[in-house]
Amino acid sequence: MKPFVIAIDGPAASGKGTLARKIATHYRLRHLDTGLTYRGVAHALLQQKLALNDEKSALAYAKKLDFNTLKPALLSSHELGEAASKIALIPALRDILVAKQRDFARIFPGSVLDGRDIGTVVCPDADIKFYLLANIQTRAKRRYQEILKKGAQADYHEILAHLEQRDSRDITRTQSPLKSAQNAHLLDTSELGIEATFKIACALIDPIIKAHIIE
């Protein structure tokens, strides 16, 4: 049976990661936050005090990166997110990680992948695709509150500026720019909580996953 794949894309702080985890738990599917794969490489470079534009080292770390060792708690900092978005501009690095992400989707009977190019590049043939969006003020507020909950200090306006820069990098990069797949379900989470978003997504997934099982 062909693996069942759910693709979830969207900009930073749109809620895609939280939705992906809830969906994976609900349907008992494997989950991959593809952003962590870029963060993992960025973390390795910074740990060795190497420049983020050190392409040779970045490619070497990407090739030997074991997705099973990626720890969200270790890789979730804002600084690593910024670093990851910068190394993601390296075409050869994206090629390596995209190939490994596709392998992940092939290996397991069912999986949920979230990122910025899942429905368009990594898994264009995914069984169902979602694209989450929210206005930038809402996303900045979410990120601000996330940081405060961790006991760290944060500046809302600084976060807003960083998100604007991140969106610009993601949307304008030449390889795998952030955009919605033509056949993706658009979910605007600006006014939606995670539970409401989850219910909408499940209502769309249920008939498709049932049909897949019957096949």
Curated annotation (Swiss-Prot):
Keywords attached to this entry: ATP-binding, Cytoplasm, Kinase, Nucleotide-binding, Transferase
Reactions mediated catalytically: CMP + ATP = CDP + ADP; dCMP + ATP = dCDP + ADP
E.C. number(s) listed in UniProt: 2.7.4.25
The keyword Ion transport belongs to this UniProt entry's keyword annotation: no
InterPro entries: Cytidylate_kin, Cytidylate_kinase_dom, P-loop_NTPase
Binding site for ATP: 10-18
Residue ranges crossing the lipid bilayer per the database entry: none
SUPFAM superfamilies: P-loop containing nucleoside triphosphate hydrolases
Keyword Zinc among UniProt keywords: no
CDD domains, A to Z: CMPK
GO molecular function terms attached to this record: ATP binding; CMP kinase activity; dCMP kinase activity
Pfam annotation, one family: Cytidylate_kin
Protein family (similarity comment): Belongs to the cytidylate kinase family. Type 1 subfamily.
Protein name: Cytidylate kinase
Organism of this sequence: Bartonella quintana (strain Toulouse) (Rochalimaea quintana)
Lineage: Bacteria, Pseudomonadati, Pseudomonadota, Alphaproteobacteria, Hyphomicrobiales
